Amino acid sequence: MDVVDELIKLHEEHVSGLLRLCGQAGWPDYGEQELKLLVQQGRFFGYQNVSGDIISCIGLFLFGRLTSIGLVIVDKEYQRLGLGRRMVNACITQTDENTAIRLCATKEGLPLYEKAGFHTAGSVRKYSCHSFQPYTKKLDAELTSFREQDFHDLTAADLAAFGGDRSNLLQQLISASCECIIARNQDGQLIGYGLSVQTPANLKFGPIIAPSSDVAAQIITRLAAGKQGPMRIDIPSEHTSLHDSLIEMGFHKDDEPPILFYQKKAPIQNGHLYALISQALG
């Protein structure tokens, strides 16, 4: 096949090629703006053919002691040439041995990742909704709109829940979000937050950080209030109590891909991560 045998770094000028690959992979939530943000926040690599077309890509997102690998795509015309394996191995070499590496695998990619040294450590449940029903249980948590002075406490809550420092990414996401909601307890302490972002395909909820599934459901209801059209949320599978609340709110489960970590290294998390930014970013 006419592949240029050099893994190159991808930049903003390659976004159109990334957009084509995402379309081919059936990932409609990644539009031009979403991909530009990801390229700015992460390290992207890929292969070209001799015509200069991007025929594969991979994203590496560094969050301190936790790294995410995502958007691993190989053009269907160039599969089974070992490009995916070479891209994954290249990303692994970009991190040190003390860093946990996570990724969300497709069924097709799972054997590749397992051969590279990844192991399954849970799963992500993808939910969608076309007719939202508000969560009616009353709670003591107070919900307010985000203000700049909340950012320090928000990032501290996110670090404890996610296990990696996403402060730079969160600054960009909050600026691009439809809404950012803060949850506080009766003492006024920040105990959680949630974001909604409009993608080309859905109104997406995430990340959502909360001390309980009830507070997470309350944040989702606030973010969805008055909104129309398709909605999506991706939650870690261990939060089974939120599953029932999502069903009551009109969501249904579409898929449950596995989460993998490299060489049994996993971050320290406090269990408060109720929804991901995306499967690529965690």
UniProtKB/Swiss-Prot annotation:
UniProt cross-references to CDD domains, sorted A to Z: NAT_SF
Transmembrane segments: none
UniProt-listed SUPFAM superfamilies: Acyl-CoA N-acyltransferases (Nat) (SSF55729)
Keyword annotations of the record: Acyltransferase, Transferase
The keyword Magnesium is assigned to this record: no
Position of the signal peptide: none
Enzyme class: transferase
Enzyme Commission code(s) on record: 2.3.1.-
A GO MF term: acyltransferase activity, transferring groups other than amino-acyl groups
Ranges of residues in domain N-acetyltransferase: 5-140
UniProt family annotation: Belongs to the acetyltransferase family.
Protein name: Uncharacterized N-acetyltransferase YitH
Lineage: Bacteria, Bacillati, Bacillota, Bacilli, Bacillales
